[in-house]
Structures are given as structure tokens and as C-alpha cells.
């Protein structure tokens, strides 16, 4: 690259990089009031989980990216795709930011989440036998995750549905996980997600959670993953 083109490239990167203008990742408001998921998830849990835990992931992600100029301007999804090259701070906090944003958007008021679309239900029946069998397998993934982590439903590269789980704030978009794919559903099984209300009864939390799953959103994600 000749010197003039190099200068132009640097100027362009400076213009498009959000960090060059003091911008950064931010915490979006919840898509519903803090008490909207009660009695499945109580208001206090939501306020602490979103306003403190998720906010901390965002703040620490911004610090990590600011300290790594090569990452400036990359989207959250782009960071996930090359997480093996970013270091633990971006892995933990970038994963925490992506996972929680995805999690909030997966839920709605109890009883308002509808049902899986015909296409998604057909895929669930094909790959798990029935919706009830899928829910049982998903619960097993959440219970089987030792310590902190997530349970996921992903669409694999061959279009199949698969249940997986990840430790800490890893997710199936990351290039370091064993089972990569497009997530369409995920549940947080860190204790801060449920302990105020359910204490050590993770299984009860996993059972109750289906009441707030927004199947309309999950069905749209499945349709998008098929494109």
C-alpha cells in the first residue's frame, strides 16, 4: 500500500470507529418493565441482573476494547467470531453483554409468549421427538452445567436443532466452543439469574421459565437461521 492510501485508510478507520468519537457499547433498556416477568422472575432479580450485572459486563467490555485498538469498530458478533484472539476480558465481558441482550429479548410477560411456529415445532419434533421431550432435554442441559453458564438451543450448519451448554459467559457464536451454531434460545443458569427467588432450586427455575419464553421471537430467529 502506498503512503497516501495508507493515510486515507487510517483516516477512514478513525471516522468509522465508534471509539474514535467516544462512543462504545451500551446497555439497552429492558424490552418490558422490571416487574413484567413476575411471578416467574421477580422485580428485584431483574433490577439487579440487568442494572448491575449486565451493566458491569458492558462497562468492562468497553475498557477491554479501549485497551486493544485492533478491536475498535468491531461489532459484538464480530468479536464473538474471533474471540480466541481477543483475550479473556473481551471473552468474559463481551460474552456477558451478548448473552444477556439475547436473553432479555427471549422473554415476555407470562402467558404472552405464544407457541412455536409450525416450522419450528416440526423441527423440534424431528430432532427431539416432541416439545415436552425438548423441554426435558433443555432442562437437563441447564441442570448439568456445573457452576455458572448457559443452556442453548442452536441451529447447526446443516439446519438441525441441537441443545448445548457453555460455561461462564461463552456462547455458541464463539470460535472456541465445541458446538458452534446460531443460537435461537438461551437460558442463564448463573445463580444471580434466579437465586433471590429460587435459592438452590435451579430445576424449579428452569421449569417455571417456559412461562415467559417468547416463542414468537424464537420462531423468528429460527426462520432467520434457515435463510
Identify the meaning behind each predicted range.
Residues 1-8:
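Bacterial N-terminal signal peptides that target proteins for export
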Residues 9-10, 20:
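Cleavable N-terminal signal peptides
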Residues 21-227:
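Feature for soluble, non-membrane regions of globular proteins
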Amino acid at each position: 500500500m502506498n503512503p497516501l492510501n495508507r493515510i486515507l485508510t487510517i483516516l477512514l478507520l478513525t471516522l468509522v470507529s465508534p471509539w474514535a468519537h467516544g462512543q462504545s457499547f451500551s446497555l439497552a433498556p429492558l424490552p418490558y418493565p422490571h416487574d413484567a416477568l413476575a411471578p416467574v422472575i421477580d422485580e428485584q432479580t431483574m433490577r439487579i441482573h440487568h442494572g448491575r450485572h449486565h451493566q458491569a459486563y458492558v462497562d468492562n467490555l468497553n475498557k477491554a476494547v479501549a485497551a486493544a485498538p485492533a478491536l475498535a469498530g468491531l461489532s459484538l458478533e464480530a468479536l464473538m467470531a474471533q474471540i480466541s484472539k481477543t483475550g479473556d476480558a473481551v471473552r468474559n465481558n463481551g460474552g456477558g453483554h451478548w448473552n444477556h441482550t439475547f436473553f432479555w429479548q427471549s422473554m415476555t410477560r407470562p402467558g404472552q409468549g405464544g407457541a412455536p411456529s409450525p416450522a419450528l415445532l416440526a423441527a423440534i419434533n424431528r430432532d427431539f421427538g416432541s416439545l415436552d421431550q425438548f423441554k426435558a432435554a433443555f432442562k437437563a442441559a441447564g441442570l448439568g452445567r456445573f457452576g455458572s453458564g448457559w443452556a442453548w438451543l442452536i441451529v447447526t450448519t446443516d439446519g438441525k436443532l441441537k441443545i448445548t451448554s457453555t460455561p461462564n459467559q461463552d456462547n455458541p457464536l464463539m470460535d472456541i466452543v465445541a458446538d458452534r451454531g446460531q443460537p435461537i434460545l438461551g437460558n442463564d443458569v448463573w445463580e444471580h439469574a434466579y437465586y433471590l427467588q429460587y435459592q438452590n432450586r435451579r430445576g424449579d427455575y428452569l421449569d417455571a421459565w417456559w412461562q415467559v419464553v417468547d416463542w414468537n421471537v424464537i420462531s423468528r430467529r429460527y426462520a432467520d437461521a434457515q435463510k
